[in-house]
Amino acid sequence: VIKFIGNIYERLRKSPKRIVFPEGTEPRVQRAAARYVKLGLGTPVLLGDREEIESVAKREGVNLDHVGVIDPAHAEDLDLFCERLETLKRYRDLGPLGAKKLMIKPNYFGAMMVQYGHADGIVTGAGEEAANTLRPLLQLISPQPHLKSVSSCTALDLSNKRYGERGVMFFADCAVIPDPTVDQLADIAVETGVLYRTLTGMKPRIAMLSFTTHSNGSLAGPAKVAAATALARQRASQRGIEMEIDGEMQADTALLPELGAKKAPQSLVAGR
């Protein structure tokens, strides 16, 4: 755990980031922001009512020195963000009052901060339902030009270093697209691989999971995964991204060397 997270810490210390936390009154979020400062990783910004944030911090014994606090309802950028919101087709009919009512919600305000460079990133979802946190992010933050779909991934750093790359594995997509198409699945694979390399510096080995291993397209579900595997390889090659992609395969085949060698002996991914 120390090495994977420690490497990210070192990169942040060399290039500190301004991170916005919309759930500014949550004690757990406040402690995370305070630790972000203590570790020298950048500048955290809590969103919410200033008095309530300070009251919670005092009650919980959280030191908010060098932690920014912005109340969206009284922020200098509120009018600017409302104007920008009304330029978006989805929100064009809101009117000034409707735009303001939406923009004072911390997740919307935080998403707009990221979209227009007022923050480098956003950390949210500690206490709210996923839909309430994802909606403003997906609607207000523009994806990179080459992306057709936006997805999520979960990073695991296991104490058992037998699995993954010394215990480090990424799983996608676990939150945003419940039933991806072939096209979306290929995007998810490649972009997760890119993120993996960015955060670890290691070559990605991507297993496209299903309930069969190399079944030759006899079933619809595995056939979709196999087609996505081929498309993901093509897209990675076109962009000059070096990564190993194989599928479809079962999870145990991907993770366990003895099963990988038995079920997919030619694979550079199975069992690894």
Predicted regions and their residues:
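Anion-binding alpha/beta catalytic cores of soluble intermediary-metabolism enzymes, centered on
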Residues: 1-227, 231-271
